[in-house]
Amino acid sequence: MLDSKKYILNPEYQRRKRWDNTRKSRLIESFIMNVPVPPIFLYEIDYSIYEVMDGLQRLTSIYDFYKGKFVLENLEYWKELNNRSYDNLPEQVRGGIDRRYLSSIILLQETAKSKEEADYLKQIVFERLNSGGEKLTAQETRNALLNGKFNKLCIKLAKNDHFRQMWQLPLESESEEKLLESERYRKMEDVELVLRFFAYRHVDYLVSPIDRFLDDYLKQANDYLDETLNNLEILFNHTVELIYQIFGESAFLLPTNERVSKSPSKTVYDSVMQAFAFNIIYKDNLLKNAKFIRENKYKDKNILFSSDGKNLFDGRNNNRADVKSRIEYFNSFLKHHIS
């Protein structure tokens, strides 16, 4: 069924796959036990062509199991079936699974009077259907409810290889299984990081909580002209490439009193990206001084660490003044190397 072109599994407002093999296995166990499974919701976009509004995780879990993409694990009641694929199950058990079905609720195309109304309806239904299940991240909600041109640009830019390497994310060219091992990927944090870069260019308007600030910016940015979107795409890619050329994969690592951490930090990312974007016209001079910049990035300990041990980049304080202070740290540092 899912191999046909009648079912669109990943409409733009859907989130990415998030279920691990244990959750997939428990779903299959429900079918074995004949436990009722909630219906899936479909939207008929054309005659007999359906978008999956709710039920992506269930449908892909069933599909993957039939295709032999995972074996059962951590079953609660049928533990003797652990480590078995569909083909290795007893014939009677396979037959029981084959007889089960998922009920579906279909919103017909004529429910909405226009494409815009249909898009809005689908997004609202998606939000309400997911409000009682697994909690969506802020970016997953944005992807569903604010999926305009700018959101699509953020998704595109999040595929930049060097951006992903600096964030220790699997590359888009890797297998789906590898991608789904990354929690940041599953929760669309990579896309939110791109959004942060553009939103923080307007730091003077920063308000708390940060999620609201990002929401408000995305609403406005979805109305940007195509020319503006093209310019922003170029700015992001050029900034990422410049930073990668100078720092490599360690660009966004957090400084500590004794060493540099092993994990990238949003506070460092925000500040480094803003400072380099602001100074992108001095790219040649910055590259000429790359070795010194790389080796002295966190040299000024008096600014980085206060007398009581607080770290400028520890992320405990994210009000406008703190964010601007962190950006200014790198801006001031770079000014010495652009002449």
Residue ranges and their predicted role:
Residues 10-215, 306-309, 313:
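Basic- and aromatic-enriched surface patches that contact anionic nucleotides/nucleic acids
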